[in-house]
Amino acid sequence: MTPTQNEIHPKHSYSPIRKHGLEVPETEIALDDSPSGPNEPFRIYRTRGPETDPTLGLPRLRTPWITARGDVTEYTGRERLLIDDGRSAMRRGQASAEWKGQKPAPLKALPGKRVTQMAYARAGEITREMEFVALREHVDPEFVRSEVARGRAIIPNNVNHPESEPMIIGRKFLTKINANIGNSAVTSSIEEEVSKLQWATRWGADTVMDLSTGDDIHTTREWIIRNSPVPIGTVPIYQALEKVNGVAADLSWEVFRDTVIEQCEQGVDYMTIHAGVLLAYIPLTTRRVTGIVSRGGSIMAGWCLAHHRESFLFEHFDELCEIFAQYDVAFSLGDGLRPGSLADANDAAQFAELKTIGELTQRAWEYDVQVMVEGPGHVPLNMIQENNELEQKWAADAPFYTLGPLVTDIAPGYDHITSAIGAAHIAMGGTAMLCYVTPKEHLGLPNRNDVKTGVITYKLAAHAADVAKGHPGARAWDDAMSKARFEFRWNDQFALSLDPDTAIAYHDETLPAEPAKTAHFCSMCGPKFCSMRISQDIRDMFGEQIAELGMPGVGASDSTEGMKEKSREFVAGGGEVYRE
């Protein structure tokens, strides 16, 4: 694996864990010495992958592991069609920027085999992917296998996405975040979406969903998968809808099935499937303030009403399971009836669908297919935990994956904040992965800067939840920052930040000179009113005496007299907190 040279801070370096023939990426942060002695480098989780030419794609890390198991076969695959890239490609006669890099024949399971991580885990096998994850999470491989076997965690790793570095989603592990990218009919290009992918993983996205609905859907996805070190998710109904000219009523199982196989062959690791939207649940949304806000949910609701029958996703769910088991694609069972406003939170429609999703989870597990369950949405703080509790009850502890939730509806332009508040709360209560929200939510398609803001905000929420849950090692990062802050190691503070660039920029707005990076104050309080500097001076001047005052056996009168004596010494010495 080639380390990236373009680190986000000069104190960062690529420092992988090398064990059992694996190379598991981590970032090492070099720290300056403290007054009391040297500090060990600090190590953090790394998602960004190797730095390569996007036209070539990433190294195929997992190919030897996949083929060594002897349960997959190469095959020709479906025929590529122009409609795969949408109506504009049909008019042009080609995609706007064809993928010209390496594209081996697709793999799928041999007849009678299931090549999912859940199938291996249930058979008692610790795969290379599980070993990789265990090193990454600093846990025992058997613990990883056990959680995957029980369905409480998933390792989304399509056999046709060997470039991905294995990661795990489950509430017993680090809280993960997802970043959504993808074009629309209005804006963006393939190059821009690949750039967003690289930008999102640079700042810490654990998975990325390609939600493209515009031109070149197939080709955009090919570029993204070939350049992604993290699992890629999609909502295949979007592409299927494009294939029938955007008319939901014209969708069919045959069109959808073909689209799913197309995406399985490309290497999509998990797919959002809105199979829980049942005909009987749609009337429950009529009294809502904001109706059905999920794009996939509204598409399927429209189809159900047009045909007055259950959706083909529900009716053909078992066949979907059979397909997913051949490629190790995980279900992300979509919450098509999620609330789009506080007024609609935790209503009958939302929870009716969640209960059905729980039943579908059990059916998928019968095929050894990995599952996570999607959740809301817009939910007041006091109503959030009920979502965790019901999901764990009805979906038997399958990983919960939520969009926020937003805890207030009054802040367009700041919904990354309104949702991060809810995200931290729901993750603390057991949600395994958080889907980021950017400042553009409800307003427009996010650009690179919005992607970064969304990722950083959600890394913060996820980490706060890990600290609250007592996840091993989570607090160590905060403690390293606090120590650097108290010792005025400014460059270490920047290096330990989630976003060093912004931390440096804010500091340098008022104190840009290089000597300010070693000063024992900042512009907030200045040199005379810095509480930490005053605390340090007090420690330096009275450290031993303070320690003595805290020792057992010192009576109250002795303590009082000792304080008076030190007060006299301080006044006699000039009465200055700061001495030259």
From Swiss-Prot:
Record keywords, A-Z: 4Fe-4S, Iron, Iron-sulfur, Lyase, Metal-binding, S-adenosyl-L-methionine, Thiamine biosynthesis, Zinc
Keyword Iron-sulfur: yes
Taxonomic source organism: Corynebacterium efficiens (strain DSM 44549 / YS-314 / AJ 12310 / JCM 11189 / NBRC 100395)
Protein name, as recorded: Phosphomethylpyrimidine synthase
Chain sites annotated for binding substrate: 180, 209, 238, 274, 294-296, 335-338, 374, 401
Binding site for [4Fe-4S] cluster: 522, 525, 530
Superkingdom as given in the UniProt entry: Bacteria
Gene for this chain: thiC
Region (Disordered): 1-58, 554-580
Function: Catalyzes the synthesis of the hydroxymethylpyrimidine phosphate (HMP-P) moiety of thiamine from aminoimidazole ribotide (AIR) in a radical S-adenosyl-L-methionine (SAM)-dependent reaction.
Enzyme class, UniProt record, top EC level: lyase
Cofactor (UniProt): [4Fe-4S] cluster
Record-annotated membrane-spanning stretches: none
Co-factor binding details: Binds 1 [4Fe-4S] cluster per subunit. The cluster is coordinated with 3 cysteines and an exchangeable S-adenosyl-L-methionine.
EC number: 4.1.99.17
InterPro entries reported in the protein's UniProt record: ThiC (IPR037509), ThiC-associated_dom (IPR025747), ThiC/Bza_core_dom (IPR038521), ThiC/BzaA/B (IPR002817)
Catalytic activity: 5-amino-1-(5-phospho-beta-D-ribosyl)imidazole + S-adenosyl-L-methionine = 4-amino-2-methyl-5-(phosphooxymethyl)pyrimidine + CO + 5'-deoxyadenosine + formate + L-methionine + 3 H(+)
